[in-house]
Regions:
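Helix-enriched interaction subdomains in cytosolic or periplasmic regions
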Residues: 1-6
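Soluble catalytic domains of membrane acyltransferases
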Residues: 7, 16-126
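Short, basic/aromatic beta-hairpin or loop at an interaction surface
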Residues: 10
Length: 126
């Protein structure tokens, strides 16, 4: 699985150079299902969250990122699945429910885009 390969190859470098500070580490999901909701500040947010999480996170990502076969292969290998953000997307909602039913962690950035100011923005519909 691509996710596991990247996580275990990159995590030592990530911790060495980035030195993340994790608050409330005990609240991270060690077992059972969970939903990880986060503000989105940079392109590296999903990577940073994946590196500190004790278990894989299945992220919902905007459909536009899946526009080529190569990108689609990598994103799906990294456990991401597409969401159409302009209206309610029942397919992605069912995918998220499936992730939770399997006792996995579902990750989402509900604003649907990066925040340039760090302030909470309105949520996307998807």
């Amino acid at each position: 699985m691509l996710y596991i390969l990247f996580k275990y190859l990159l995590t030592p470098f990530f911790w060495l150079f980035y030195r993340p500070k994790v608050k409330n580490f005990g609240r991270l999901f060690f077992r059972g299902r969970g939903i990880l909701i986060s503000n989105h500040f940079s392109l590296g947010d999903p990577i940073r969250l994946a590196m500190v999480a004790p278990r894989p996170i299945h992220f919902m990502a905007k459909q536009e990122l899946f526009d080529t076969p190569v990108k689609r292969f990598f994103l799906k290998g990294l456990l991401a699945f597409p969401v159409y953000r302009k209206q309610a997307d029942m397919v992605s909602l069912k995918q998220a429910m499936s992730v939770l039913e399997k006792n996995h962690i579902f990750g989402i950035f509900p604003e649907g885009r990066r925040s340039l100011t760090g302030e909470l923005d309105s949520f996307e519909k998807g």
